[in-house]
């Protein structure tokens, strides 16, 4: 059996160290996409350039717009070149750690931010960004109707525009369980069952974005009075913690392409398309959709932008088909525009949960640090 495991970008690690900011001028250089990125990804040239801005006067804008984002931002050069061609605006990308670091940097700057647009604030940190007054109101005129379900509640919807969506879910190595004649797990409770002792690995909640999402999933599932007891049962059942997703998936997970011995891992609903058996054309892994926690990424115009019209045009561009169509195979997330065709392997093996676990962003903002301290007490005990 020949298994092809295609590496995906490292997920967004939570802030644990200093912040390095790298600036890429997309008018002149490549974003350095992974060599294993599929060549079949739709090109920006496949879409009409006028879609790139949402403004009839876009070509007259000109200048530069500074985009502050996270380190996992991976958009082909030609995609943003389409925006530049349509608007005359050059996009200067500045990366700043993960989603948590991104928000922290902007909040600590206290309005003194040399940027125009932010992309990559996720639903976990959105309320903090809105409450800090970081964002100017803007709603794209051509926002897809399907994006409305991902909007933040209340006035926050005017500040941040949903761009992509993904589910963090428990993934299993189907081949491992089939070869041993073992019934695969299906639920959170199964992970704490002695039948699955020493089989689960997850990135830690304090050092990893998917790890935090899994913690939040357990809070949503078991409630504020029950999640810590569940975690105690997980640890008593031999759960292994890693510092990040990449170690959990590529080192410890049996289907991660290494020598791992754990057939259950915290990953993404979009992971199965990247573990396809080249002989059968079938994925050897699956996501347990009843364990999924929904994450939405947003973009917004920053208050104090030096080029607000161009900033608004860039946010508009991010919900256009030109940008939405490159998300699955470049950033491994689902577009919020459900009219965009997904790659064939995504259509077959990637699926968003029908009823994902979610917590109100404000509730997360108010309790995140407390939950993390309590989590560390459990796993460190």
Identify the function of each model-found stretch.
Residues 113-118, 136-172, 189, 199-205:
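A structural signal for short loop-to-beta-strand junctions that line the ligand-binding cleft
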Residues 195-206, 317-341:
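Periplasmic-binding protein-like
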Residues 210, 216-290:
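Ligand-binding pocket segment of bilobal, Venus flytrap-like solute-binding proteins
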Residues 29-33, 46, 51-128, 254-257:
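Early extracytoplasmic/lumenal segment of secretory-pathway proteins
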Residues 24-28:
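C-terminal motif of bacterial Sec signal peptides marking the signal peptidase cleavage site
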Residues 123-134, 155-183, 211-221, 296-300:
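Periplasmic solute-binding protein
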Residues 171-176, 295-310, 318, 326-330:
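A bilobed periplasmic-binding-protein/Venus flytrap-type ligand-binding module shared by bacterial periplasmic
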Residues 136-144, 160-161, 189, 276-293, ...:
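Short beta-strand->loop
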């Amino acid at each position: 059996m020949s298994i092809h495991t295609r590496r995906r970008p490292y997920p967004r690690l939570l802030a644990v160290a200093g912040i390095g900011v790298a600036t890429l001028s997309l008018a002149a250089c490549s974003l350095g996409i992974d060599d294993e990125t599929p060549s079949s990804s739709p090109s920006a040239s496949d879409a009409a350039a006028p879609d790139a801005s949402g403004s009839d006067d876009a070509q007259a804008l000109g200048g530069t717009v500074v985009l502050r984002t996270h380190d996992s931002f991976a958009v082909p050069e030609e995609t943003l070149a389409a925006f530049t061609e349509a608007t005359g605006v050059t996009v200067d990308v500045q990366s700043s750690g993960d989603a948590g670091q991104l928000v922290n940097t902007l909040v600590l700057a206290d309005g003194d931010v040399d940027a125009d647009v932010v992309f990559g604030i996720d639903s976990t940190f959105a309320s903090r960004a809105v409450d800090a007054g970081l964002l100017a109101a803007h709603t794209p005129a051509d926002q897809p109707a399907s994006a409305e379900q991902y909007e933040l509640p209340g006035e926050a919807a005017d500040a941040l525009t949903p761009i992509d969506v993904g589910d963090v879910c428990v993934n299993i190595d189907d081949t491992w369980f089939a070869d041993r004649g073992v019934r695969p797990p299906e639920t959170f409770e199964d992970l704490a069952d002695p039948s699955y002792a020493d089989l689960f690995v997850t990135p830690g909640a304090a050092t990893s974005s998917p790890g935090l999402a899994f913690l939040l999933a357990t809070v949503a599932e078991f409630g504020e009075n029950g999640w810590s007891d569940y975690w105690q049962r997980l640890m008593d059942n031999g759960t292994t913690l890693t510092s990040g997703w990449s170690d959990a998936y590529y080192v410890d997970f049996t289907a991660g392409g290494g020598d791992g011995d754990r057939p259950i891992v915290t990953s993404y609903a979009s992971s199965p398309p990247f573990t396809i058996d080249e002989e059968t054309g079938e994925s050897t892994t699956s996501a347990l959709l009843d364990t999924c926690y929904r994450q939405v990424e947003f973009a917004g115009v920053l208050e104090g932008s030096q080029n607000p019209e161009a900033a608004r045009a860039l946010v508009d561009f991010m919900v256009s088909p030109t940008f939405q169509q490159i998300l699955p195979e470049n950033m491994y997330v689902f577009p919020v525009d459900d009219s965009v065709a997904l790659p064939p392997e995504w259509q077959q093996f990637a699926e968003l949960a029908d009823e994902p676990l979610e917590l109100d962003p404000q509730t997360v903002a108010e309790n995140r640090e407390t939950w993390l301290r309590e989590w560390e007490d459990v796993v460190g005990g």
